[in-house]
């Protein structure tokens, strides 16, 4: 049986003129956004990639330079058309999006057994640091232009029985917001733990451990003001909300009309500065919780942050996409230059749509 092609993630350029999609067919595709006069007729138009290249093995994790742009003329920075890709039994590698050539391989070899460690999660920050997460809750930090890690550590806490001590994701900040470092970075594990990564310290600090039936943290999203953290878990029908100042206690939850299953069609949530938090569904629609709600953690103005009552908040809106309702809308991300325009993965295809269109 032929394997279905699924989009794993989408990354917009910082200027909104192009975006990149990564798929489970080992392919990385780059798309140009049509001219402004043509974007009002995009609801049913599928896009053809401007460039594409294929690796010879599956892509476990990937990340793009936050300053990625086809029109980057800032000679003071390294070229922005770069993507880092992690796979099994292979070093983490930096590729050019334009020609698909490998530019640099990072040293991810385990010195004890001589094997390359699988990078399960990766992030590039605004200071060109590459963060990697692997098994045994190991985090390493690289300068983007150097192969050797400048910082490396792992948690000494052991995962509970049946849990995986793997760093599964790093904190994601809203595209289109202030591209500024917010100090320490959060990361999550498949053992439902949240850690703080701070290269000024010599160890990972565990900030949260949730005893739940959920199958592990897969995304950590931050509100634009940086005060609230939204945690997406596998095998869960809700997104947990935490106050960043107190990550030990769940503040509220966003209620989902489905359960996030552990399969190849990974549904991703996304926060942007204009529309709040959006997420695709198995039936091809898009759920949305507005910016005002997201920026205040779902806490009504008459409530105290210390109020012990947890509110389960349903979606404020559900948008239809005029596409096949039998195929999940797995990834949806807004254009930073035009928030009403968003790139949508629908199975293995990519399209551009407008909210309300």
From Swiss-Prot:
GO terms for cellular component: nucleus. Its main location: nucleus. It is found in: Nucleus. The keyword Nucleus applies. The keyword Transit peptide does not apply. InterPro entries: SWT21/TCAB1_mRNA_Telomere, WD40/YVTN_repeat-like_dom_sf, WD40_repeat_dom_sf. It comes from the Eukaryota. Keywords: mRNA processing, mRNA splicing, Nucleus. GO terms for biological process: mRNA processing; RNA splicing. SUPFAM superfamilies: WD40 repeat-like (SSF50978). Disulfide bonds: none annotated. Associates with snRNPs. Belongs to the SWT21 family. Involved in mRNA splicing. Helps to stabilize the U1 snRNP-5' splice site interaction. This is Protein SWT21. The lineage of its organism: Eukaryota, Fungi, Dikarya, Ascomycota, Saccharomycotina.
